């Protein structure tokens, strides 16, 4: 799930300058994407990804196709320029729109995956703790067995700045629990989402970021729950 990144993610001395501002840079990339699509007969400047790639990580913008004709170079906030954002597209069929993946969460996910790998090599299975959804195969993890010493790894939400917990599925993928952000969004924004709808799009519609490394959620009694597909 994080295979599109490798090595050192971003030099520390470039973090501050390449984190903000990003609003103008999103607009610049959106303009370049629109021009490319018009010039290329509807084709989008995308990197090739496997069909099973999670939807919000599937449509990565290929800046090599945009530069230098439509944009001088990738914006400073882009991963390709040493920044901490991966530029992606959503609504590719109807209204291709530029959004961001916050890559600061990748280090925590990668570290957890490595610890699980070493544990599983010794024990034959990950250190599952409790089922979060037995039917979907989502589990919490016993972090003490992974050497976290009474602490739990987390990622910082690009939406709220809250600490978001992590969990695992039966395929070994590490996933981010966006339920706190979804709960807030359901209360904050007017919407027509009902049980059975994927409410992650409420975040996409109202923020510049996509909920990367996530699973589908829906709403029941005004609360976010895992979507039963």
Q: What is each model feature region?
A:
Residues 3-7:
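C-terminal motif of bacterial Sec signal peptides marking the signal peptidase cleavage site
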Residues 9-12:
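Bacterial signal peptide processing site
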Residues 16-23, 27:
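Juxtamembrane membrane-water interface segments immediately C-terminal to a transmembrane helix
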Residues 25-41:
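N-terminal alpha-helical signal peptides/signal-anchor transmembrane segments
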Residues 45-109, 116, 120, 127-229:
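Extracellular/periplasmic head regions of type IV pilus-like filament subunits
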């Amino acid at each position: 799930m994080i295979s599109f990144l490798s090595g050192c993610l971003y030099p520390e001395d470039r973090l501050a300058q390449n984190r903000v501002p990003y609003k103008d840079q999103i607009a610049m990339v959106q303009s370049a994407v629109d021009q490319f699509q018009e010039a290329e007969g509807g084709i989008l400047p995308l990197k090739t990804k496997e069909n099973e790639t999670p939807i919000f990580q599937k449509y990565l913008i290929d800046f090599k196709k945009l530069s230098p004709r439509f944009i001088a170079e990738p914006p400073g906030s882009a991963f390709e320029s040493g920044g901490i954002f991966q530029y992606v597209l959503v609504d590719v069929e109807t209204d291709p729109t530029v959004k961001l993946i916050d890559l600061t969460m990748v280090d925590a996910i990668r570290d957890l995956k490595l610890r699980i790998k070493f544990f599983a090599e010794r024990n034959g299975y990950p250190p599952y703790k409790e089922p979060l959804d037995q039917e979907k195969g989502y589990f919490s993890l016993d972090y003490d067995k992974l050497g976290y010493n009474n602490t739990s790894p987390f990622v910082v939400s690009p939406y709220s700045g809250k600490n978001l917990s992590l969990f695992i599925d039966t395929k070994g993928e590490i996933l981010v629990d966006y339920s706190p952000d979804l709960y807030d969004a359901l209360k904050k924004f007017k919407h027509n989402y009902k049980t059975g709808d994927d409410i992650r799009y409420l975040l996409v519609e109202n923020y510049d970021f996509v909920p990367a490394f996530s699973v589908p959620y829906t709403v029941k009694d005004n609360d976010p729950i895992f979507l039963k597909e």
